[in-house]
Curated annotation (Swiss-Prot):
One Pfam match: Ribosomal_S15
Subunit structure and binding partners: Part of the 30S ribosomal subunit. Forms a bridge to the 50S subunit in the 70S ribosome, contacting the 23S rRNA.
GO biological process: translation
Lineage start: Bacteria, Pseudomonadati, Pseudomonadota, Gammaproteobacteria, Alteromonadales
This protein's name: Small ribosomal subunit protein uS15
């Protein structure tokens, strides 16, 4: 199950640069993080759901690549984003 429209709109409002910003790296990483967190709860109940696990690994890989791009191009925005999302410890 994917994120609801309201949840996506809230993430867009929080992380987007402008009102209709859906493609910036920050928004994409925030949406992927929300989907990954949602799927982690799914896997606590459905341990053997390997098809969805493949999708989870794909999302994690995409998020990792976007974060690497953001770190390489604009380190300040990268630091702010990981602090907001609580990704690095």
């Amino acid at each position: 199950m994917s994120l609801s429209v309201e949840a996506k709109a809230q993430i867009l409002a929080e992380f987007g640069r402008c009102e209709n910003d859906t493609g910036s790296s920050e928004v994409q990483v925030a949406l992927l993080t929300a989907q990954i967190n949602h799927l982690q709860g799914h896997f606590k109940e459905h341990i053997h759901d390997h098809h969805s696990r493949r999708g989870l690994l794909r999302m994690v890989s995409t998020r990792r690549k976007l974060l690497a791009y953001l770190k390489r191009t604009e380190n300040v925005r990268y630091q702010e984003l990981i602090k907001k999302l609580g990704l690095r410890r």
